[in-house]
């Protein structure tokens, strides 16, 4: 009897309940002894102050789950004794959990409920539910009173801590706290956390602490609403719209949530594929970093060619990858391929190469395929899927290969995998009764035979077994996702699947008009699952509200409804859309594709790669976006060819009297865009049926050359006009025409000059037209050997024309200063050049960067000064050509 009583009292007594626990340290009332719980669940006396600090630190950052000495297996639950409130204890067999906040051990509540017991939030013990107080929270009045006093003390301590905090820290914490109720992407974690807080215990730590440990501090900034507006989150939006998000399992690995952070930094150098010339690898620099995306810039070229990619993109590689894999790297503008060296270039630029560890595509497992370089296949143009042409595999990297259209330039090549729906085995078109576009210039067009073509080209067809069938994408209409805005790639918007086909989806931006919808491949890296922006720290553009659709944005200043003044139709990040003409969302730009001169056409550096005849096929950025355009040109080809022959006869007759009577400008009879299509928009049928029509087309272009708007000038000889307007490839075929000076102005007769004197009012109108033409790109292709917009910019500096660089190199510092002051808008900058003792020779060696950064001159005047230097050099070159 005595033994049973003693055992019962020993079982009822819990040493943890008689101690005061705080930060993992237990204090025994009435003594100075301090205890801690070791890794085996046993109590240990703390003898050193440093040991106590380490215990507190470990408790603040760790969630302990260790068994105690009382957690021995005992009798079944039905035979377990129920203790009175004064002797509440831990149920046997239940593991102990130590709170991060208090360090007090407690047991899991779920298991106790299954046993019919109640948990006391103060002493962290269990007992009969019939004897509990305050709705089952406390076992006695003492515990309830003690818990109330503790809460009041915590509130006072919290207020004092907030007052002592750094104001900067407090400002940072306010938006973070406001996001806890809004970021419902982590709803399950938040529900668990709130439930644990109600129980007086924090099992996983606060959400902010977890994010800080993961390094996702940018996630806390995402989704902050503008002033006066409500916050936006996916969970409430899906509930309001009664919509369903696209399941994450439908996205490919490169579209779904990344495993690592984006480690790229602004200024890092790397190698990558040019998206407009996918057969070409270029030197790139990280211009911007936003979430898991990076904006890449072509070294030496305008920022209008910058483009966005994900940090795990397959088309970017570390420095030295091309040399290692045997690929040709195109150096920056102004560098020769044989002289370019990465080490010296990085040293010159004082830049850092992106670490190899940042490139996810370096660890790809290569799966063997049946494709080999040189094999033939039938491939569709991605911009016009109905056009299927003869193609060749020209390169292979990992699990992808490069498709090149035979006898077409490389600007239409693209990378794909073996399961791409755009490629087919040899004979697929014949089997499915589809039209196969043969290579331009191929002799046997009417009776094309694959067997004969393979024999002539000494090549093999890609085996049919190498082509894999792509499974259905699974996307359904009205599902929600996040998608990149192709008209303004800086933004990722809330989107809906508006329509689907076999391998594509139609993306609709919520709140916007359906005129902005566009088709995109289901495996495109520009679409992501719901919550991708929040997880990666990328800003997500919420749907437009009805108020934003009724009134223009007050902050952006753009008249287009919904536009906030960010972005530009011509990709210029630094020009605000203050007018509808520049807004990418305005009605006048909806039907336009972003038409830029080819990045390589204005390259003045020595050619490092063969120039490709871009006139053999239409520009995909202009008119190849729809199959109807190509079919229309193909149907009307015969009629156009006959007209060209007639124009050729007329042109030869008019060329004889070109000095006597100028012909009217083509702008009166044909718009510039139509001229561009005549020159570039030849479908494959055109190129293959009438190779002789190119000469007639060149003659027609010579007749239809647009004239300068300021003064009527006599028409030049056809040879000179062809040399000025023909593409670079056509100039190579006509060396006699290419030898003509391209910058020399036409010689006017004195009588014509007198007749061309405009009035003062006309002069003002012409000056405005010149300024507009210098700012906005024309449809006329630029002269290949001169920089972009050269003709437009040179019109703004008439006083510079005709001065060769050899004369400028002999100028003194005073003469350079006087010249700078003579330029419009540069009157105050002449003194700066004089103070820096810059003579003519040093002036010619200056770059635009030197003028802006070293001389501290604003961009506008710097452009005029730098353009004058270019004009001096061009005049010197023209003088040598004339000799």
UniProtKB/Swiss-Prot annotation:
Cross-link Glycyl lysine isopeptide (Lys-Gly) (interchain with G-Cter in SUMO2) per UniProt, renumbered positions: 638
Subcellular location: Nucleus
Ranges of compositional bias, category Low complexity: 663-742, 749-768
Main localization of the protein described in the UniProt heading: nucleus
UniProt repeat feature MBT, residue ranges: 232-332, 340-439, 448-543
Gene Ontology biological-process annotations: chromatin organization; erythrocyte maturation; granulocyte differentiation; macrophage differentiation; myeloid cell differentiation; negative regulation of DNA-templated transcription; negative regulation of transcription initiation-coupled chromatin remodeling; positive regulation of ubiquitin-dependent protein catabolic process
Pfam family, one: MBT
Gene3D superfamilies: 2.30.30.140, Transcription Factor, Ets-1
Entry's Gene Ontology cellular component terms: nucleolus; nucleoplasm; nucleus
Composition-biased stretches (Acidic residues): 157-166, 185-194
Span of domain SAM: 811-875
Tissue: Detected in hematopoietic progenitor cells in fetal liver. Detected in adult bone marrow, heart, brain, spleen, lung, liver, kidney and testis.
Region (Disordered) residue spans: 146-223, 595-768
Record region (Interaction with RBPJ. Required for transcription repressor activity on Notch target genes): 1-64
Listed CDD domains: MBT_L3MBTL3_rpt1, MBT_L3MBTL3_rpt2, MBT_L3MBTL3_rpt3, SAM_Scm-like-3MBT3_4
Zinc finger motifs (CCHHC-type), residue ranges: 549-593
Description of the deletion phenotype: Death at a late embryonic stage due defective erythropoiesis, defects in the maturation of other types of myeloid lineage cells and anemia.
Annotated keywords: Chromatin regulator, Isopeptide bond, Metal-binding, Nucleus, Repeat, Transcription, Transcription regulation, Ubl conjugation, Zinc, Zinc-finger
MF terms (GO), sorted A to Z: chromatin binding; identical protein binding; methylation-dependent protein binding; zinc ion binding
Compositional bias of kind Basic and acidic residues: 146-156, 616-662
Its biological purpose: Is a negative regulator of Notch target genes expression, required for RBPJ-mediated transcriptional repression. It recruits KDM1A to Notch-responsive elements and promotes KDM1A-mediated H3K4me demethylation. Involved in the regulation of ubiquitin-dependent degradation of a set of methylated non-histone proteins, including SOX2. It acts as an adapter recruiting the CRL4-DCAF5 E3 ubiquitin ligase complex to methylated target proteins. Also involved in the regulation of ubiquitin-dependent degradation of methylated DNMT1 and E2F1. Required for normal maturation of myeloid progenitor cells.
Quaternary assembly: Interacts with RNF2. Interacts (via SAM domain) with SAMD1 (via SAM domain); the interaction mediates L3MBTL3 binding to chromatin. Interacts with RBPJ; the interaction is required for L3MBTL3 localization to chromatin and is impaired the Notch-derived peptides containing the intracellular domain (NICD). Interacts (via SAM domain) with KDM1A. Interacts with DCAF5. Interacts with DNMT1. Interacts with E2F1. Interacts with SOX2. Interacts with SFMBT1.
Descriptive protein name: Lethal(3)malignant brain tumor-like protein 3
